[in-house]
């Protein structure tokens, strides 16, 4: 008994399904047996078809700055009314919606006007929903690659305004009229709709605003009908963290190394130039990386490119400064003469201002009196030379202790043997050469000190130039913000 009842229920359910399918099939034949999809759904030729449009963004795939191409994944919601597909669900078993292939009904043929790859249409021809009263709804997905003029002035702290321009490929403004869709609360959706649950956030770009506007263009001079464009603007802001970590911070650190060249000795010009040129080469590599990222345009220079050019100029000036300081440090009295004014400014005044003067000289103790042993040696030499007894020499020494015996010695040396005179001349020559070398060493030391003074001046100048220039360049990016447009945020 229970089995028979179950079979009866299954049979009734199958009959009900079959009846429902028959009602849909009957509705299908009722609507499409005499339907012409190539004819516009109007009763009079001057009538206009109203098209309700809604764009839902599911993914901001990428913005290729090099090719100036924006890739997006969207759903295009299109609603309109076709009087030829009007029916009452009461006449067809309560069928509320009929799903039919899109090629069976009239379509407004909406395309993306500013596409870049020739794909004007949608990615998948979804079914069209036909509802009671002749209302049609079509929601096809699409992946668009559109043009986007990239402004690189403040890269990587920039924001871009990319547009999606839709229009009917076949019909003009007098044949179709575009309006924005309305939500369940009756509010007009005049922007790109972003479903926070379905939207996939982009790691490089954040969407700030996405307003839409409908713009009608006038016809030609002959009075022909114009076109209607639906323009959606995607105002996106770059997330600069990737570029800060991978480009800006290493670039600033490497550029700061060039200042370390001033801590090398003034005579080490080769090593200082090597440090500066190595930094210059590293900056060239960073500039090459930025050139591969930004579009090939002469309209503007990226902020990061301007910074790299600035630090390259600073590094070049430091190389020139190292060469000049090396030239000054290696000068000698035989090739150059130091003027008193230059000596005063660079060796006296400037070190005091910079707090880098030479250490104070330690006063030397007075030379001790000549010991008796040295006096005995002198007397022994005079005895040998003058052939006088030691007692007489001692007597003369006691009588002329303060200078007279030295004069007598010099007079008697004039009559001495030629060999002794040659020795004395050689000793005098050595003493004179030693005095000349000491004087020359002091002059060379002054030139080295002058090179150090120039190094100190240029170090502080380069440090101030580096800090001020870097601050001014990056502060410009701080003020480059998305303007507060009179549009609600997208998310």
UniProtKB/Swiss-Prot annotation:
UniProt main location, coarse: membrane
Protein name listed in UniProt: Acetylcholine receptor subunit epsilon
Disulfide bridges in this chain: 148-162
Signal peptide range in chain numbering: 1-20
Domain of life according to the entry: Eukaryota
Species in which this protein is naturally found: Bos taurus
Membrane topology category: Multi-pass membrane protein
An MF annotation (GO) of this entry: transmitter-gated monoatomic ion channel activity involved in regulation of postsynaptic membrane potential
InterPro entries linked: Neur_chan_lig-bd, Neur_chan_lig-bd_sf, Neur_channel, Neuro-gated_channel_TM_sf, Neuro_actylchol_rec, Neurotrans-gated_channel_TM, Neurotransmitter_ion_chnl_CS, Nicotinic_acetylcholine_rcpt
GO biological process: acetylcholine receptor signaling pathway; chemical synaptic transmission; membrane depolarization; monoatomic ion transmembrane transport
Role description: After binding acetylcholine, the AChR responds by an extensive change in conformation that affects all subunits and leads to opening of an ion-conducting channel across the plasma membrane.
UniProt-annotated glycosylation sites, renumbered to this chain: 86, 161
Transmembrane residue ranges: 240-264, 273-291, 307-328, 457-480
UniProt KW keywords: Cell membrane, Disulfide bond, Glycoprotein, Ion channel, Ion transport, Ligand-gated ion channel, Membrane, Postsynaptic cell membrane, Receptor, Signal, Synapse, Transmembrane, Transmembrane helix, Transport
Localization in the cell: Postsynaptic cell membrane; Cell membrane
Residues on Cytoplasmic side: 265-272, 329-456
Record lineage: Eukaryota, Metazoa, Chordata, Craniata, Vertebrata
Catalytic activity: K(+)(in) = K(+)(out); Na(+)(in) = Na(+)(out)
PANTHER family to which the protein is assigned, alphabetical: NEUROTRANSMITTER GATED ION CHANNEL
Family listed: Belongs to the ligand-gated ion channel (TC 1.A.9) family. Acetylcholine receptor (TC 1.A.9.1) subfamily. Epsilon/CHRNE sub-subfamily.
């Amino acid at each position: 008994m229970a089995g028979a009842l179950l079979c009866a229920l299954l049979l009734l359910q199958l009959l009900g399904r079959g009846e429902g399918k028959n009602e849909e099939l009957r509705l299908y034949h009722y609507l499409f047996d005499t339907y012409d999809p190539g004819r516009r759904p109007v009763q009079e030729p001057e009538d206009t078809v109203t098209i309700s449009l809604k764009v839902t963004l599911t993914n901001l795939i990428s913005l290729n700055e090099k090719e100036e191409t924006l890739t997006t994944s969207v759903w295009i919601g299109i609603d309109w009314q076709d009087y030829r597909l009007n029916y009452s669900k009461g006449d067809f078993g309560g069928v509320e919606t009929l799903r039919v292939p899109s090629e069976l009904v009239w379509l407004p043929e909406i395309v993306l006007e500013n596409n870049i790859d020739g794909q004007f249409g949608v990615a998948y021809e979804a079914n069209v929903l036909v509802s009671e009263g002749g209302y049609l709804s079509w929601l096809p997905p699409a992946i668009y690659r559109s043009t986007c003029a990239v402004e690189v002035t403040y890269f990587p702290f920039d924001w871009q305004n990319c547009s999606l321009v839709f229009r009917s490929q076949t019909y003009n403004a007098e044949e179709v009229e575009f309006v924005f869709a309305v939500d369940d609360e009756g509010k007009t959706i005049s922007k790109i709709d972003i479903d926070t649950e379905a939207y996939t956030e982009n790691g490089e770009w954040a969407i700030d605003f996405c307003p839409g506007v409908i713009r009608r263009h006038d016809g030609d001079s002959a009075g022909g009908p114009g076109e209607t464009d639906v323009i959606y603007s995607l105002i996106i802001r770059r997330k600069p963290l990737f570029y800060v970590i991978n480009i800006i911070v290493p670039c600033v650190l490497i550029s700061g190394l060039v200042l370390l060249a001033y801590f090398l000795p003034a005579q080490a010009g080769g090593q200082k130039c090597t440090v500066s040129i190595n930094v210059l080469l590293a900056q060239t590599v960073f500039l090459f990386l930025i050139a591969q990222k930004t579009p090939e345009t002469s309209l503007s220079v990226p902020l990061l490119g301007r910074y790299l050019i600035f630090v390259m100029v600073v590094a070049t000036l430091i190389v020139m400064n190292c060469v000049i300081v090396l030239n000054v440090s290696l000068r000698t009295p035989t090739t150059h003469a130091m003027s008193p004014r230059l000596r005063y400014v660079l060796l006296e005044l400037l070190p005091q201002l910079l707090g880098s003067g030479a250490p104070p000289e330690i006063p030397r103790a007075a030379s001790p009196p000549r010991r008796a042993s040295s006096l005995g040696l002198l007397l022994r030499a005079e005895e040998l030379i003058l052939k006088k007894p030691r007692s007489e020499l001692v007597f003369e020494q006691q009588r002329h202790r303060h200078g007279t015996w030295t004069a007598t010695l010099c007079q008697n040396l004039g009559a001495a043997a030629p060999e002794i005179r040659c020795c004395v001349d050689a000793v005098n020559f050595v003493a004179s050469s030693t005095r000349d070398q000491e004087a020359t060493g002091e002059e060379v030391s002054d030139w080295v000190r002058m090179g150090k003074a120039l190094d100190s001046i240029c170090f502080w100048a380069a440090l101030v130039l580096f800090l001020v220039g870097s601050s001014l360049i990056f502060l410009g990016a701080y003020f480059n913000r998305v303007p507060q447009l009179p549009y609600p945020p997208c998310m």
